[in-house]
């Protein structure tokens, strides 16, 4: 049985995560106090210290992005591309800063990578986040400066000489994406890398007061989600019997029923529905448990939800109903089942 960190359902693949679109800004945020000095006006290099990356940190820590990354790391084409880049980068660059690798082979491999649906989904969500985040506008502009790549290379060279980071970077160089995934959730390593790059840590990551109590509270509050995700029927029953909220929402507005149906844990879904869980609960993207079950082809969960009054016509933020989501994900058996119910 997978752990809860390995079993977090993705947002149905039609989601663009554009519900929090913000106006773009070209105003350069101020550097954090105590940060190294910014480049002078005559230095066109990239000022890593002038940008708040907390928004991107939130995206990268999104459970759906993490699971996409894990799936991508297992893709043979992506690993081939990563190995090719690893072989070329350590050998140095030609004049002009271009890595020494075969462009034709690179393009062929990249084309294979782009055929990976998980890669396209993650690239789209990250791209949207970059474009919509006003803090990232000056960062993206700065990346266009030739001096930025030189400054980035200098930072990387310094990191490789850091006694704490050197073995970690060496392991990532040798192991590729799979080794990188090992450190994805390591807050200490990520903080050290951020510090070495001069990237300010978001305020939510710097608050150290009473961390253990907060974490314990989170775990206790999410026990219903955890047991439902893991298919732990007895644990779920015990959690509900001890006062657990059957319709408790996580930070994305997802209830335990969303999780159970996303994973196909039909017995847990039945327990929740028997306890009176809302079959039409919506998350922040207005996805219902039926959207999740339909998108992942969980036919038994779809049938169970329909028997308990789940709405086939409920639309999410992209104006997609469960039938649309199932069709987008080529879940043809589920499409037939939903269409049959819709026309009854």
Swiss-Prot record:
GO terms for molecular function: lipid binding. It is found in: Cytoplasm; Nucleus; Plastid, Chloroplast outer membrane. Its main location: cytoplasm. Residues 1-50 are annotated as: Disordered. A 1,2-diacyl-3-O-(beta-D-galactosyl)-sn-glycerol binds at residues 225, 248. The keyword Oxidoreductase does not apply. GO terms for cellular component: chloroplast outer membrane; cytosol; mitochondrion; nucleus. A 1,2-diacyl-sn-glycero-3-phospho-(1'-sn-glycerol) binds at residues 296, 298. ANK repeats lie at residues 219-248, 252-281, 285-314, 318-344. InterPro entries: Ankyrin_rpt, Ankyrin_rpt-contain_sf, STI1/HOP_DP. PROSITE patterns: ANK_REP_REGION, ANK_REPEAT. SUPFAM superfamilies: Ankyrin repeat. It is a peripheral membrane protein. Keywords: ANK repeat, Chaperone, Chloroplast, Cytoplasm, Lipid-binding, Membrane, Nucleus, Plastid, Plastid outer membrane, Repeat. PANTHER family: ANKYRIN REPEAT DOMAIN 6, ANKYRIN REPEAT FAMILY PROTEIN. The ankyrin repeats (ANK) mediate interactions with hexoses-containing lipids present in organellar membranes (e.g. chloroplast), such as monogalactosyldiacylglycerol (MGDG) and phosphatidylglycerol (PG). Binds to chloroplast outer envelope membrane (OEM) protein targeting signals, as well as to chloroplasts. Binds specifically to two chloroplast glycolipids, monogalactosyldiacylglycerol (MGDG) and phosphatidylglycerol (PG). Interacts with APX3, APX5 and TOC34. Exhibits chaperone activity toward chloroplast outer envelope membrane, mitochondrion outer membrane, endoplasmic reticulum membrane and peroxisomal proteins, by recruiting specific proteins containing a single transmembrane associated with an AKR2A-binding sequence (ABS) and subsequently binding glycolipids (e.g. monogalactosyldiacylglycerol (MGDG) and phosphatidylglycerol (PG)) present in the membrane of the target organelle. This is Ankyrin repeat domain-containing protein 2B. It comes from Arabidopsis thaliana (Mouse-ear cress).
């Amino acid at each position: 049985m997978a752990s809860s960190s390995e079993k977090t359902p993705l947002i149905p693949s039609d989601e663009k995560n554009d519900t929090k679109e913000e106006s773009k800004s070209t105003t350069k945020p101020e550097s954090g106090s105590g940060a190294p000095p910014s480049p002078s006006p005559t230095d066109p290099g990239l000022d890593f210290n002038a940008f708040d990356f907390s928004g991107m940190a939130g995206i990268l820590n999104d459970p759906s992005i993490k699971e996409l990354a894990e799936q991508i790391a297992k893709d043979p084409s992506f690993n081939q591309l990563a190995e090719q880049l690893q072989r070329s980068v350590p050998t140095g660059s030609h004049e002009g800063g271009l890595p020494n690798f075969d462009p034709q082979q690179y393009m062929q491999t990249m084309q294979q990578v782009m055929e990976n649906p998980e890669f396209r989904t993650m690239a789209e969500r990250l791209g949207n986040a970059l474009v919509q985040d006003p803090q990232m506008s000056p960062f993206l502009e700065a990346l266009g400066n030739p001096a930025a790549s030189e400054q980035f290379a200098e930072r990387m060279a310094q990191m490789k000489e850091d006694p704490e980071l050197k073995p970690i970077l060496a392991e990532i160089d040798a192991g590729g994406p799979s080794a990188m995934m090992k450190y994805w959730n390591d807050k200490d390593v990520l903080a050290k890398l951020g510090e070495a790059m001069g990237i300010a840590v978001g305020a939510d990551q710097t608050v150290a007061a009473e961390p253990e109590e907060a974490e314990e509270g989170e775990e206790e509050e999410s026990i219903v989600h955890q047991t439902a995700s893991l298919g732990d029927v007895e644990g779920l029953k015990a959690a509900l019997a001890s006062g657990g909220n059957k319709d408790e929402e996580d930070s994305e507005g997802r209830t335990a029923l969303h999780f159970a149906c996303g994973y196909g844990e039909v017995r847990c879904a039945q327990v929740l529905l028997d306890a009176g869980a809302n079959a039409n609960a919506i998350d922040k993207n207005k996805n219902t448990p039926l959207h999740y079950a339909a998108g992942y082809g969980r036919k038994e969960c779809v049938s169970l939800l329909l028997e308990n009054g789940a709405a086939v016509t409920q639309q999410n933020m992209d104006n997609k109903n469960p039938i649309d989501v199932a069709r987008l994900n080529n879940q043809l058996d589920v499409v037939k089942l939903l269409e049959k119910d819709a026309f009854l």
